[in-house]
Design a protein with these regions (language model features):
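Active-site and NAD+-binding cores of ADP-ribose-processing enzymes
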Residues: 44, 72-75, 79-156
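Internal glycine-rich, Lys/Arg-flanked active-site/core loops of soluble domains
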Residues: 1-100, 104, 108
Length: 157
């Protein structure tokens, strides 16, 4: 649950397709304005599948984030999210955005501007580069690859 919102049943059958496309369109447009710098994503208590850690037939390790992916410029914020569930696995993705592979900076419109959020569109690929341990947190250096087929609303209609 994110920020206290319940499971899918609370949507009363509405899957918010138009809203999802509108948000995605904003990310596609605004990501072009985001400075290519390092961002972090903290995950608490989650277990990634074995297929994430083992190289596939092309020699690549990682996976695809099916949903919008929230990250932050602030490593401490990510570490706080990762350490949220005491006694459960703590993981932080550390990623360097590039010339093409960038998320949209949301601090200017966020209810939580101190989190310095950068949002990536659905279907962002995360390719594992290396890992290290920082205290009780596993830090995974990943290379993001944004979904280049994502269209803006103007392209869809």
């Amino acid at each position: 649950m994110l920020r206290g919102f319940g499971p899918h049943k609370d949507c009363k059958g509405n899957t918010y397709v138009t809203t999802t496309h509108a948000i995605n369109s904003c990310i596609v447009k605004n990501s072009k304005l985001t400075k290519a710098t390092k961002v972090f994503r903290g995950i608490s208590g989650g277990m990634l599948p074995k297929s994430f850690w083992e190289a596939n037939d092309q020699g690549v390790r990682g996976g695809i984030e099916a949903a919008f992916m929230s990250t932050t410029y602030d490593r401490d914020v990510a570490m706080q999210y990762a350490s949220g569930d005491a006694g459960k696995p703590a993981l932080v993705f550390e990623m360097q955005m590039g010339m093409i592979d960038r998320g949209a900076e949301l601090g200017w419109l966020s209810q939580y501007p101190h989190e310095e959020e950068v949002l990536f569109n659905p279907l962002t690929g995360l390719e594992v580069q290396s890992t290290r341990v920082d205290g009780a947190v596993l830090v995974v250096l990943v290379k993001p690859s944004v979904n280049l087929t994502s269209m803006t609303l103007e392209q869809v209609i």
